[in-house]
Regions:
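Substrate-binding pocket helix/loop in short-chain dehydrogenase/reductase
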Residues: 48-49, 56-61, 158
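Active-site loop immediately N-terminal to the catalytic Tyr-X3-Lys motif
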Residues: 50, 98-104, 126, 165, ...
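Active-site loop-to-helix junction immediately N-terminal to the catalytic Tyr of the SDR YXXXK motif
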Residues: 52, 99-107, 119, 147
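Alpha-helical segment proximal to the catalytic Tyr-Lys
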Residues: 77, 122-126, 186
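Residue(s) in the substrate-gating loop at a strand-loop-helix junction
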Residues: 93
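Short C-terminal tail/terminal secondary-structure segment
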Residues: 98, 178, 189-202
Length: 202
């Protein structure tokens, strides 16, 4: 890892449980509390349902679901042991809420993640651990310009399909995450929050 003032940055694969445990052990060693975690890692695979193989599904689930499952489990044990008032924010997707062509594997992981979030929220509310999930729509990221240029027809469809007639800005998702990890949301757990310009309501 690299050390920068009071910030420690770890690089690695989120499915590497040894790395995850190392992060928490380091926080204990440095006498720092991890009050919140945001699970944002994910991979997407486009493939027709009848072309999908079990291995394809396993690969997507490994990153999008099982790694987050393990991180949440380790974090809950950590929070309970050190009596930390904690907040977990998972990042879902509108693809996990509605059906999308050629995204059966990806959408399944996001649907499973939403259920996991709610279950953990209910089971560990008594331990002062909150868990919520943010459901972004189409958001402008580094992928945006390439998508707009290479898939103009699909891009125009997403604009027209979204009631607010635009893609979201990344800071609009970040603002929701900041709210959910703050004390301003101290009575909120087991909930999902759509940041999608009205997509799922239309």
């Amino acid at each position: 890892f690299k050390k920068n003032n009071n910030i420690k940055i770890f690089y690695g694969d989120v499915s590497n449980i040894k790395l995850i445990k190392k992060i928490f052990k380091t926080s204990i060693k440095d006498k720092r509390k991890i009050n919140s975690i945001v699970n944002n890692a994910g991979i997407r695979q486009r493939k027709k349902f009848l072309k999908l193989k079990t291995k394809d599904i396993e690969n997507v689930f490994k990153t999008n679901f099982f790694s987050i499952f393990s991180i949440m489990q380790i974090y809950c044990l950590y929070s309970i042991k050190y009596k930390i008032k904690s907040s977990i924010v998972n990042i879902g997707s509108i693809v996990g809420e509605n059906g999308f062509t050629e995204l059966a594997g990806y959408s399944s992981t996001k649907g499973a993640l939403k259920s996991l979030t709610k279950s953990v929220a209910v089971e560990h509310a008594k331990d002062n651990i909150r868990a919520n999930i943010v459901i972004p729509g189409f958001i402008k990221t580094s992928y945006f310009n390439q998508f707009k240029q290479d898939k103009k027809k699909l891009y125009n469809w997403t604009i027209n399909r979204t009631p607010m007639l635009r893609w979201g800005e990344s800071n609009e998702v970040v603002s929701m995450i900041e709210f959910l990890i703050s004390d301003d949301s101290s009575y909120i757990t087991g909930s999902s929050f759509n940041v999608d310009g009205g997509w799922l309501s239309s």
